[in-house]
Amino acid sequence: ELYPQKPVILLAFDESEIKQLPEEFQKSSIDSVFIWSGNANVLLAIVKLLEDKMNIKRDIKKADVRCIILIEDSPRYYSLILPMIYKEISHQVKEMVDKSASDHERLLYMRGRPRILLARSYEEAERYFKRFRMSTLGIISDIRFPKKDKLDKNAGVKFARWARSIDPSIPIMLQSKHNK
């Protein structure tokens, strides 16, 4: 514990590698787990996600940036979707910037891109929404994820109802890899 403020990320080849680690090691030593799928963009997404989480308060206060809350507990799925979300945000910001803008202006626009906050449980998503509601552009949520430390097959629907009771106009996209 020489550097307690430094995040520790586990980049695993598949979920079986994670299961081989002792549970107490996973909870005490590892901040985030990602799954390698052969897409090098996951490395950039990991860095951006960490920067977003570390800088969100300051960025909202100083630059009035917005955020998107992603609720997903599956390392495999968020390892796939985060690079796509960051790529799409980057594309949209570039499209928004006037072609006649200087390099400096383009850089300022890119720094103002929406931040992504990854929540892996109902309670974490609730904390993010309560804290950053006025700066939240929208919510992307899985249907099934932990609530009160137990997998809840309707947590996404419950969270959407709760968020809409606070802000009826908040955009919410529910998605699931499960058929039912």
Language model features with spans:
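Acidic, metal-coordinating helix/loop segments flanking the phosphotransfer/catalytic sites
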Residues: 96-138
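Short boundary motifs at domain starts and secondary-structure transition points
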Residues: 55-63, 107-108
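Short, aromatic/basic amphipathic alpha-helical patches
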Residues: 20-26, 82-86, 180
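A short, hydrophobic beta-strand element within the central beta-sheet of small alpha/beta folds
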Residues: 1, 5-22, 31-37, 72, ...
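Receiver (REC) domain switch/output surface
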Residues: 22, 29-32, 38-57, 84
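Residue immediately C-terminal to the conserved phosphorylatable aspartate in receiver
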Residues: 1, 114, 141-148
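Acidic catalytic/metal-coordinating carboxylates
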Residues: 121, 149-158
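Conserved acidic segment of CheY-like receiver
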Residues: 65-76, 81-105, 116-118
